[in-house]
Amino acid sequence: MRLKIKKSGSFKYSKKYLDLIAKTKVYDVAEKTPISFAGNLSSKLKNEVYLKREDMQPIFSFKIRGAYNKIANLTPQQQKRGVLTASAGNHAQGVANACKKLKIPCLIVMPVTTPEIKVKSVRRFGSKVLLHGDNFDQASKKAIQMAKERKLEFIEAFDDPMTIAGQGTVGKAVSYT
């Protein structure tokens, strides 16, 4: 699903995004996390600061929300073929976790400079990893090329309505607290 949104230099909020956020499937995999008062930070900034504890998610990041929502909303045919993405960190783990949960084949292209702990974390979820390029842009270019050649769905880390809607559930959760 692609939403047509005019690009005008600033992000335009849309009722369509709010509708997508309301219909997300993220709680099939994401945990409901608390909001905690940050005493030390509040003192330092002379203001009340609260933290949404997304570090308590299975991958220690909110990125699981967007990745899972996008992948869970693929067609059965797309899911059967598998997915591909590029990332050097939390998005890769979110995609790998979602694919394990949904039993979908997954290949993640990561720069050769990715810390070994991140690579191991992705492999722990059962995803295949290809190390390519010295930076994210090179890895991403390779992943997009491979997705086209193999007719796999490329899972965007941020520039996709379903990914944005999944990640937007953080705001929804904060508003209900």
Regions found by a protein language model. Give the residues of each.
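PLP-dependent amino-acid enzyme catalytic core
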Residues: M1-Y176
